[in-house]
C-alpha cells in the first residue's frame, strides 16, 4: 500500500475497492500487524460495512480505537450512486436476481426530483434482505444466501441531503446524498423504483466521505490520531491529577471546554457525543457530564 503509515492504534482511512468485502480489509490489516509483531494480537475492526459491489472510504479501527465503533454511526456519510431504472433485484444491486421489470421510458427529471423529495429527513426504512443486519443473532445476508426467507423490521434512518447529479434517461441517473449511519442506499433505489412504477437498483456506489474524512483513493491509507479522532466532540485538557481521579472513578470539575475541531453540517442531528479528554496531546478518555461534574465514560489506555 503506497504511502501507508504504520498500523498504530487509532483510526485509519482506507479505500475499499470494487469486488472485495469490508472484512477483507480487516484481514489484511490483521496480517500486517501479525507480521510486524509476531504473536501479539491487536484488535481490528471496520467502522461500517461497504458491500462488495461498492467502493470508497472504509474506516479501519485498530487497538483501543475499536471501542469507538458505536460513536461513528451518527455522523454524516457521503455517497455517490448510479441508479439503473427498469429492473428491481432481490439484493438491490447489480449482483442480484431480477424480481421485477418495468418500463422507464416515461421518466422525467421532474418526476425523479418529486419522488426523491419524500425521502429527505427521518423515515422508517426496510433494510435489504442481503444486508449485514442481524436476524436471530446472524447476519441477514447469510440466511438469504442459504435461500431462507428474510423479513427484516424497518429501522429509523435519516437522509440529510439528496440531489440528482445527472441523468441518462430512461436508463440511469446519478445520485449524490448525505445520510446518517444505518441508511441503505440500495433500499432508497428500490423504493424510488416502486414509487415511479418501473423498478430500480444500484449499479455503483461510492462512499466519498465520513464526517470530515475523505476517501484517500486506491492503494492509499491515512492514520488519524490525537485531535483528528472524533473531531465533532468538544475537548477537555486533563492534568496528571485529573487523570488519576478519573481512573479511581472519581468526578472532576467541568473546567474549560474547547469547541469541536469540526462542525456538523447545519441541521444535521446532534450525535450527542461524549467529551474528549486529552492528556499530553493524546486522547485518553471519553467523559460524560453527571451532576455538574465529569466522570469517565471510557478509558483509552495508552491514548490515541
Can you annotate each of these PLM segments?
Residues 70-85, 150-164:
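Structural signature of FAD isoalloxazine-binding scaffolds in flavoprotein oxidoreductases
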Residues 132, 139, 144, 172-214:
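Pseudouridine synthase
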Residues 71-127:
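Acidic, low-complexity central loop/insert segments
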